[in-house]
Amino acid sequence: MNDWKRIVVKVGTSSITDERGNPSGEKILSLVRECVKLMRANKEVVLVSSGAIASGREIMQKLSKRKDLPAKQALSAVGQVRLMQYYSQLFSIFKQPIAQILLTAEDLRDRKRYINISQTFETLIEEKVVPIVNENDTVAVEEIKIGDNDTLSAKVACAINADLLVILSDVEGLYSEDPNLSPNAVLIRDIYEIDEKIEKIAGPGKGTGGMYTKVQAAKIVTEAGIPMILAKADLENVLERIVLKKEKVGTMFYPVERHLNRRKHWMLFMAKPQGKVYIDDGAKDALLKKGKSLLPVGVKKIEGEFVRGDTVSILDLTGEEIGRGITNYDSSELERIKGKNTEEIKNILGEDFYEEVIHRNNLVLINRGDS
């Protein structure tokens, strides 16, 4: 944890705009200088930057008065170009090449696309390019929307196997209470476990950039073995102090001891389950306590249509999700063999069949003791 090489930096809209909400060349230049400083110290930097819609409002003032989704997407389309102009001009001062990557949730849910994106990042990083990432708001309807750049930055950090995620914000870190409301609020410097208490402090999941989304981002990366630091964006030399000088800045979220491997992490946090498989108490016990694979005999009910190789949710009979996994059977096959033992399955499908619906190597539990 003392020598972070690959760093994902996320910056929010308020951290790169002025008091009127327009992009601030001064603030963006300060951020660019910091990123270049890390690059020249032989670090690898990926920047996740908000600010496209704000940049669009600066240009399209009439359109900015509209509140509908097409207007927001149009503002984002115009603003993303403007935002990248800022970055291109300012990084070019230091002769630092950059690239633009726009993502949707679907790009990360699909395993092949996810791997391809990871490889693209790798190539850019190898070539000493700073990838600048944003959500592709222009095409991101609700079903394929990541929703906020805190979550996006966490998923990018996992996709590229980063050593550290730094979220720069307008707050110093996570406080014990809302510092705007309570004089007794204390900055929490170290968080080793994101439990109910921490989630309660973060508040309800409203909005697209509050403390809740930052804690959820921390949950995603720490489960992948990646630490996260939440710090104030306008702190002078903040990235240098965190990465190069190893100063204690903001709130540090430490990775969990038994973190998920990349494949299982993708299943739990990236993939969209294509169906639901309900299991009996015996199968639940075998998964949770004995680390076994899921067999057809333990399956009670199936919902949704899915094909072999899809990710599905595994639920107990109360409807609580206990895990996710990659299925060896499509939904129609599983419907025929659910609750059946090996001999019965042989009579239905013949000799060529899988013993497991989901092999333990392709299964991840929500509350894990084994993964």
Swiss-Prot record:
The keyword Ubl conjugation does not apply. GO terms for molecular function: ATP binding; glutamate 5-kinase activity; RNA binding. Pathway: Amino-acid biosynthesis; L-proline biosynthesis; L-glutamate 5-semialdehyde from L-glutamate: step 1/2. InterPro entries: AceGlu_kinase-like_sf, Asp/Glu/Uridylate_kinase, G5K_ProB, Glu/AcGlu_kinase, Glu_5kinase, Glu_5kinase/COase_Synthase, PUA, PUA-like_sf. Residues 274-352 form the PUA domain. It comes from the Bacteria. It catalyses: L-glutamate + ATP = L-glutamyl 5-phosphate + ADP. This is Glutamate 5-kinase. It comes from Dictyoglomus thermophilum (strain ATCC 35947 / DSM 3960 / H-6-12).
